[in-house]
Amino acid sequence: MLLNRLEKVLMNNPVRAAFQRHLEAPQLLRLGGPLAGGVALEVGCGRGVGIELILERFGAERVEAFDLDPQMVALARRRHASRGDAVRVSEGDASAIEAEDARYDAVFDFGILHHVPRWRDAIGEIHRVLKPGGRFFAEEVSERALENPVIRRLLDHPREDRFDFDEFCGELTARDFSLCGAREVLGLGGFVVAAKSA
């Protein structure tokens, strides 16, 4: 689901970037540890802040990333043009990832799957494209946060089949992931790292 105009502003500003750098990345690193090189995928890359973090903080050698919105793809490509072959950005859909099976050492979700109407399919696709033993790093917002009347009025999110944090983690284990670590935050969402069975 594409972001509305207000949510694009909220997700593509220095405050959101600082939140990713100083809260999300450190939490996910604590739960899942760094990568030892390898190729990572970011689903819903927006303007490309997550790509920087995956390379510089998590230690991926290369990042492939996609977004549903062509405008965000253009911004991310511009932001990372100097990185050459280390970054590839394209249009894509998390519920139908265009990659071969077992391609990635890690997949990153910085608050994207709650925008995906078929989020369960997206988890299945993430599992499919991860190598055995590969890790899925996710920061997600749960149903309770999205039910806030102000959020409901101003921002567009799928209304059907929303998840709470336990349900999100449960779907991961149902898809043959093992949880490396999880931290719920105030019942509004949280951080989870899960590994695909080897």
Question: What spans do the regions from the language model cover?
Answer:
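Class I SAM-dependent methyltransferase SAM/SAH-binding core
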Residues: 41, 47-96
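Conserved alpha-helix/loop element of class I SAM-dependent methyltransferases that forms part
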Residues: 18-37
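A short glycine-rich, Lys/Arg-flanked "PGG" loop and its adjoining helix->strand segment in the class I
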Residues: 120-132
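Class I SAM-dependent methyltransferase Rossmann-like catalytic core
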Residues: 2-22
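A short acidic, Gly/Pro-enriched loop at the edge of an enzyme's catalytic core
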Residues: 95-106
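A short SAM/SAH-binding and catalytic strip from SAM-dependent methyltransferases
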Residues: 106-117
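C-terminal alpha-helical "lid/dimerization" subdomain adjacent to the S-adenosyl-L-methionine
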Residues: 18, 137-193
